Every structure is written in structure tokens, then in C-alpha cells.
Amino acid sequence: MATANDKLQDESIAHAIWIARYSTSVANRMIKILNDSDAELTARLLVAMDSLDADSFTVSRLEALLVSVRALNREAVQSMYAGLSDELQQLAQHEAGFQLSLFQFAIPDDVLSLHPLVGISPDAVYATAMAQPFQGRLLSEWADNLEADRMARISNTVRQGFLLGDTHEQIARKVRGHANRGYQDGALQMSRTNAGSIAKTAVGHLASTARKSFADANDDILKGKQWLSTLDNRTSKDCRIRDRLKYTLDNKPIGHNVPYLQGPGKIHFCCRSVETYILKSSDELGIAVGQISDSSRASMDGQVPSDTDYQGWFSRQSFTRQSQIVGVTRARLIRDGGMSPDDFYNDKGEWLTLDQLRNRDAQAFKDARV
């Protein structure tokens, strides 16, 4: 029978997968907000350059002519920031409720009757996350930095284009990129990438803040926490070395000397790590014999869940959850075709299509009857 701590670990891993996917969708929406302004930004840039020729070109004159471009850039980044703030407010609502339901699911009812849980305010979670820096800056400061970075890339590209003798249209394409390349070869592409990283990191930052807020409110039933890293070929060295390491509630190492630093979800940009809290045993909670059932006492053993890798965790999940994570066909390939989750990636960590998988292992598809 799974103990309360086993349940916390399993559901924390499942939730980490959901958070990672959600952060990617948020990042894509934020990038789209910026992209929606690019056509108008390019048009304004062309108008500005029409008033400037190579003979009269100076940096100060360029900056003066880019006023309307700068205003549109500011408007685009502010729209992205407003959109991201709204996403985070909605996530705070979800995470506050999830943390409570997670512990209610893991802890037996008769234990909860003796040690009721304390809920947390979504508004407080959001306010705390917005007031705490991640990767050295507040979210509002990251937005300001993104605005300045985009504008600097535009100005530098225009200046370089004039020095090289490029036409205005060539300069505009260097700024935005080429349509037949998905606009990924322009000067603005790095800013898009940075915007996506900021969005993903902000989501992880808020989820981590919600976990900590709930733990702080219910620290009477907790005795520590364990770092859980997503182990694959994209895992950072900082997260890989901390996987499964235990810490006290105030971030002191237990049985090792690896520092906690900013913690999972915050230790670096786009961090996918989470942590699971370790419940005290019924004895440590001072619950006398007879106050709870024998099964509840066995569930509240206070032991740290045994080490598990992603494949071991995945195999324990229901087919429904497996299908939600990798899709029905891939879930069948794992259950009946002998594949593992690692088989879905190439050696560069890229997600393989079903056609690519079929070319690699046609027998697995036959065995799974897909």
C-alpha cells in the first residue's frame, strides 16, 4: 500500500509535468503578443528610415527618428507583461487549491481530523511571487530589461545596415527576419527566446512560491523536503546533482553538503525541478495508539519515498494518466510494445514523431497493435 509520502511524491511528479507543459503554452502566448506587433513595428521602422540617408546618418539622428518604433515596442512589451501577470494570477488560484487538495488526498481523513490543514490565499501567493526576484530581478524588471534589449537590437541592426550600405527593405528584414524562415533569422528572434524563458521561469517561480507558502502554513506536520529533478538529457548540472537530496524546511542539507541555493523551480532559467514535502510520522505528530486506524498509522510512517526514476514512476501510473502525458499511441507502445519514455527522444533530446518512431522500431508498433 502506498504511504502518504509515496502519494505526495507521485502526485508532485505528475504536477511538475503539467506545470512544464503549462509554462510552454504561456511562453508561446507571450511570444505571440510580441509577434503581433512586428509587422507594424517594421512598417514604422521603414517610415523612420525614409527620413534618413547614409550621408546624413548619425546615431543621435537615428535615435530621434525611432521614437514611434520605440513607443510601439514599449506598448508590445507592456501588453506581454499584462498578459503574463494575468496568467500568473490565474495560476495562483489553481496552485493554492492544488496544494490543499494534494495533502487532503495523501493524508488519511482521521489524521486530518486531528491535524487540520491550513489553506493559503491565492492573492497572497501572487503578491509574494511578484515581490520576490527570480534570477536576480523582479518580473517587472525583467519586462523593462526585455523592452530595452529589443530596442537595442533594432537600433544596432539599423546602424549596422547603414554602415554596410543595405537598402531600407534589407535592414527591415534583418530586424524582423524572413517570412520563409518563420522570422527566426531576424534580430528580434533572440528577444523572442528571452521572452519565452522569462515566461517559463515566472510560471515555475509562482508554483514554487505556492508550494513554500503552503508548507509554511502547515509546517507542524512536515519534517523536511526532497528535491525532485526531471532527469533527461536536458537536465542542468545544478539540478542533476540535487535530485533526491533532502533538506530541512529552512533549506539546510540533510546528510550531504550540497547547498539549496534558490531551490527547485528557481535555481536557473526554465528550471523544471520541484520538491516533495516529507510528512511526519503518526508518532512524531503525537498521535496515540487508538486515535487513528492501523492502516492510517501505517500510511503515516514518516519515511522518505524510495528513489525512483521517471520510467519507474511512469510505469506505476494508470493508462489514463499515461495517455494524458504522452498520448494514447505512445502509452500503448510503452505498455504493449516494450518501449520506454526515453525512446521517444533522439540523442539531442528532440521529441520524435510517430513516423520516426515507427521507422526506428516497427516491431513495437506491431506488438502494441497501433
Which ranges hold each PLM region?
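Acidic, glycine-rich two-metal-ion catalytic cores of nucleic acid-processing enzymes
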Residues: 186-291
